[in-house]
Amino acid sequence: MRAEIENYVKKIEQSLELLWRSLDVEASTERLNALEELTADPSLWNDQANAQKLLREKSNLEEKLNAFNKLKSNLKDALELEEMAEAENDLETLSQIEQDLKNLSIIAAKFETECLFSGEADGNNCFLEINAGAGGTESHDWASIMMRMYLRFAERLGFKTEIINMINGEEAGIKSCTIRIIGKRAYGWFKTETGVHRLVRISPFNAAGKRMTSFASSWVYPEIDDNIAITIEDKDLRIDTFRASGAGGQHVNTTDSAVRITHIPTGTVTQCQSDRSQHKNKAQAMKMLQAKLYELEMQKRTDSVNEQNAAKTDNSWGHQIRSYVLQPYHMVKDLRTDYETSDTKGVLDGDLEEFVSAHLAMNVGGKK
């Protein structure tokens, strides 16, 4: 067996072993069989809320077990084909098998990470806010680099994106933006990215070529679906309209189509100017508000609201989650997990999967 092929096979087998334990395949299969019996009973629908809950559990188990079995079957097929190709010295087929196994190892690693998702909203779409820290043009440029990094990360995962709101910097970059990320498990993949990001580089805006430090923050919160109830009273809202202009609206409005909603009790603010329709912008801003309030409630339940609020509002040294050093050496380091890589170009081009996996694995392991 070729060394490259053997390497990919070992990676996939390791993933399968971890997935077997993580999924508890035998117990999950028994539970799925029990759910199939329960959901086949017509009387189940006498309690629609419970019926929907059981159907969601059944669908989730089916998806995970089917993916596991397909992964296992694809590896078996590839190994059988590899054995025949080796016997016939079929170099073209061996090359194709190597590529297929490489792709399979990527799928296995992604599936392995997704099996660590355990939150109520992990399967939902999400919103990502980026805000430049103090420092003017330097931080504005860093915020725009972060926006591109996350758009590329979403693209790598097969998610769609919509820029809901964006405010440009005076000279370069952006002051802030809100991105809607659309796809199954989007929140699960992005939720660990909330916090402050620090960049060290030679400034492209300084004629003396000085090394500069910039900060920008990101905050991720899930889009709320019908399965999660968030009650918002009209008396608690202040709704303002204004004219959309520049990036985010992609045009200059002559009417007040942009909408800003303030939740008075919490001071939470959302705004949207991505559509020409004030009605659609209001609906999107309300959806974002529901999502933010849900995230705040989840933070309270886990007794981490103070830490999380500080992480998303205070762009300072004390609340960093990750540092990106481009000078005098190249290194991106997650300060929560200590995971690091010298491939700064890859990271800024959206290669964040290992950072997410490391953080999720740390949480499962109970580390702080």
Curated annotation (Swiss-Prot):
* Post-translational note: Methylated by PrmC. Methylation increases the termination efficiency of RF2.
The answer on whether this UniProt entry bears the keyword Protein biosynthesis reads yes
Residue(s) carrying N5-methylglutamine: 250
Principal localization?
Answer: cytoplasm
Instruction: Look up the coiled coil feature and give its residue ranges.
Output: none
List, alphabetically, the NCBIfam families matched. prfB (TIGR00020)
- What is this protein's record name? Peptide chain release factor 2
Organismal lineage: Bacteria, Pseudomonadati, Pseudomonadota, Alphaproteobacteria, Rickettsiales
